[in-house]
Amino acid sequence: MSTGPPTAALDVRALLATLDRHAVRYTVIGGIAVQVHGHRRTTKDLDVIPAPDEANIGRLVRALAELDARPRDAPGAGPPTAQQLASAPTVPPLTTRHGELHVMRDVPGAPPYADLRARALVVDLDGLPLAIAGIDDLIAMKRASGRAADLRDIAALTAVDQPER
């Protein structure tokens, strides 16, 4: 249960445009990725895995500053630093001017970032290139999580691939 202040309504396009302006390399996972792969469901946040190199983390820090990103459960704290983003096993959920953003680092079931990105589906969202975790990687992450919502996503995603009878 969140104890922080309510976040702005999710505006995925605005979040992604900010990351794009700062040339942040990332791959989208979570609910948005599930939607792109054909399962229509709601989500209240954007989940991304950033490329882990130092230069990319620096660009991500600048994008988070522009977004006024703050830890959801520590509203008095400032945006994460490059050191926190590079070394923290878990980055707390962030509130931003455009909704909640989850910057994920060590995601159970996820391959190394280079492999995740190489297998990503790249789509165009109103002129923004968007790397979405490939369906097999997405299912592996959801299976490793084991949460009820993730298991429902797996069932829906695998049903999408099944021919109708």
Residue ranges and their predicted role:
Residues 1-165:
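Compositionally biased terminal segments of proteins
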